[in-house]
C-alpha cells in the first residue's frame, strides 16, 4: 500500500538529527529575511511609485500613515512632509499626497476620459453599510450618482428658502439664551453654544425634532455620541490601513484596540437616527419643510431612495452638518477677535446694512461681501475637513497635477498642507480676508487650492445650506453683540490653544477637528 504524504513526512523528520533541524531553521530564517529585504528594495527602488519622493519608512510600510491617523496628527504630519519633499509625496507604499491646486480637479473632479475616481475602501464614515446598502458618502460611483440626484432637490435654493424659517427659529433661540448669560457677567464657552445650535438646527432639518441642546444649555448623550463618531471612524480607518478591509485581522484589531464605548457612540447615533427617521417617514403628511418632507414630495427622490438609504443619509447628514459647522464658526470667531481691523470692518458692514434683525434673511446675507470673505478665509485656515480624502486611480492610470500616476494607486490632496503652502498662497498662515476680494497683493494666490467642501461629483451636497447657516448665525451674532476673547486666567490659557502659530499646531484631527473650548465675553450692542 502506498504511504500517504503525512506518513512520508513523519518518516523523513524522524531521520533528521538535531543538526539537520537546526540547519533547516536557519535556512528558513535566511529565506524569510532575504524575501523581506527583496520586498523592501523593490518598494524603494522598483515600485511604480519609486520615482516619487518620501520618507523611506513610508515607502515600505503603512505604519506611519496609520499611526498619524490614530493619533489625530495626519494633517500636521503631511504638512511637514510636503514642506520637506515638495508638492507630491509618497506617503505610503501605494499612496501619493498632493498639494497643487490642479490636483483637486484631477482627483475629485469629473474625468474627461474614463471613470471618475472611486473612494478608497479604507475610508469609513459616520455610519457603516446596512443590509448591503450604503448612504451617499460611501456609495460606489453609480449608486452615488443615483442618490445625489435624488437628494439634490432637498438642497435646492427653493428648498432652502422654505427651510429658512426653521433655521431662523434656532438662531432666535441662540440669541435669546446668550442675552440671558450676559446678565450673569461671566465668560461664555462659544465652542459649546455653536455646537448646541448646529445640532438643534440639523435635528430639526433631518427629523423635525431638535436635539434640545439650546433649551437645556448643554449637550445631550446623542449629540456627544455624534461628535465622538468621527474619532471612532478615524481609529477604524487607521486599522484598515495596516490590516486590510473586512479581513479577520481588521475585525480582531477593532475588537482589541478600539474601546467598547466607541462602538457605543456609533450605536447610539445610528439607533436614534433610525428611530426618528422612521417616525418622520410615518408622519409623511406633516407640513414641516425639513429634508424628509422634500424627499417625500419629490417623486424622483421618493422612488429612487430605499427606506434604508433614507435612514443612512439622515445619519450622515446629522454628523456631517453639525460638528463640522460648529468647528468652523468657532475658528472664525477666534480669527476675527484676534484681528481688530477685520472685526471693525466686519461689524461696520453688518450693522450698517440692517436696520433690524428681521432684515437678516436668506436673500440679504448674500450681499455681505466682507462677511463672505472672512468665512472663506476661515474655511481656508480652519477647514472642517482637514484630513486627506483618499481616492483610487482608475485602471490605466491618470495624470494628476502634471504627473502620470499608475492605475490602482491611492491618491489624495492634503488640505491642511495645501493651504499652508507658500506655493499656493502669499503669507499662507495669516488671516487676511482681502485675498478673497481681489486685493492685488494676492494676485498670485491659487484660491482653488482651498476646497473645504471638496468638489466634483462627491463635493459636499449641502454647501449652500452650510453657507446660509454660517452667514445667518454670524450676522445675527455681530448685529446683537460685541464679542471679545477672554485673555486672562484659565480660560485665557485655553483660548491660546486656537493659536495656529502656537499651541494650535498641535490641535488634533479625527476626520474633523477635535476642537477645544473657546471662552468669550459678550456685550449687547446698544440701540
Curated annotation (Swiss-Prot):
Induction: Expression is persistently induced 60 minutes after the addition of the ABA precursor mevalonic acid (MVA) to the medium. Its EC number is 1.-.-.-. GO terms for cellular component: membrane. Gene3D superfamilies: Cytochrome P450 (1.10.630.10). Signal peptide: none annotated. The keyword Transmembrane helix applies. Glycans are attached at residues 189, 420, 448, 464. It is a single-pass membrane protein. Its cofactor is heme. Disruption phenotype: Impairs the production of abscisic acid (ABA) and leads to the accumulation of 1'-deoxy-ABA. Keywords: Glycoprotein, Heme, Iron, Membrane, Metal-binding, Monooxygenase, Oxidoreductase, Transmembrane, Transmembrane helix, Virulence. Belongs to the cytochrome P450 family. PANTHER family: CYTOCHROME P450, CYTOCHROME P450 MONOOXYGENASE ASQL-RELATED. This is Cytochrome P450 monooxygenase aba2. It comes from Botryotinia fuckeliana (strain B05.10).
